[in-house]
Amino acid sequence: MMTKEAPLIALVAGEISGDILGAGLINALKLHYPNARFIGVAGPRMIQAGCETLFDMEELAVMGLAEVVKYLPRLLKRRKQVIETMLAEKPDIFIGIDAPDFNLTVEEKLKASGIKAIHYVSPSVWAWRQNRVQKIARATNLVLAFLPFEKAFYDRFNVPCRFIGHTMADAIALKPNRSEACATLNLDETQRYLAILVGSRASEVRFLAEPFLKAAQILKQQYPDLQFLVPLVNDKRIAQFEQIKAQVAPELSVHILKGNARQAMIAAEASLLASGTAALEGMLCKSPMVVGYKMKAMTYWLAKRLVKTKYISLPNLLADEMLVPELIQDECNPENLAWYLGNYLADDADHRKQRNELKQRFTELHKLIQCDADAQAAQAVVDVLEANTSDQN
């Protein structure tokens, strides 16, 4: 039985983004339960917030099928360890943060033994592998969703879900400060910039760097004063990008940045980016964007048959309309990319009006998902802990 003042709260995060969410949630929960104890699998931020960790979170942070297969015995051993520890400790609640392939099985086992379970960050069940919703229903007392269309999806299947808003929408100002962004990046704010984000994964850089760079070459001919900002997540991606650039666009001058994608998109007039979280971040930065994506032909063939949504980018999914161009596979070629970006760079009255209208829509969508997500998530945990789960709106 839970002692109201000092619940035992378990959390498992599997990567950096989950560690950030976990730390925000722990700090918000402490306002409700100053004497709570937090255990689980934590990264540095969660540990700093006061979470005891069973092992280094890095052990769960594997990407891609090949890596998962390679580390599967270790992952299964760690999952068994987490389940056994939780069954022994009997936390008042277990919160799996993202990492659904790891966490949903843990949640299902714990819920079956009478431990309340929450899954924080909905897997993309609304887009593909929709049959997973049955497992999520069995595994959880509540799903915490970043986006309103995710809650609408769970409502269709009668799975308890609460929309809490997006932490990124809380972190970015409704009116981003371009002067500040330029100063942070040591850029001349009188210049014109285009941000180019080729993705954080090696496969994304491999497929997108060439068409994105060639599109930049076309735009440079049309707009000689245009400069290019290329934020990359780490040294590996920088080296990979520079190698491709040396082959396809050796003469093109670009500003390569380590990190700082957000500042780059705020400083730039427009962005060319890979689908994914970057598109949501670009929308919150009020950056007119073109979304481009390429993958292996076989992967694309499969994805076309599996993906159930009309759009691939989060701004379009949120708006439920084609707000920003999505150029996928063969359409993601330099000429198309440059043409659509040209609409954002042209300086006539019609194009200026279109850009302002787009930014206004971005602001409306920003407000829709700016809900103080840490506090909302904490309140949802409190409600489940105290069994007040009748209203999950």
Swiss-Prot record:
The keyword RNA-binding does not apply. Pfam families: LpxB. GO terms for biological process: lipid A biosynthetic process. Pathway: Bacterial outer membrane biogenesis; LPS lipid A biosynthesis. Its EC number is 2.4.1.182. This is Lipid-A-disaccharide synthase. HAMAP family: LpxB. SUPFAM superfamilies: UDP-Glycosyltransferase/glycogen phosphorylase. Keywords: Glycosyltransferase, Lipid A biosynthesis, Lipid biosynthesis, Lipid metabolism, Transferase. It comes from Actinobacillus pleuropneumoniae serotype 3 (strain JL03). It comes from the Bacteria. Signal peptide: none annotated. It catalyses: a lipid X + a UDP-2-N,3-O-bis[(3R)-3-hydroxyacyl]-alpha-D-glucosamine = a lipid A disaccharide + UDP + H(+). GO terms for molecular function: lipid-A-disaccharide synthase activity; phospholipid binding.
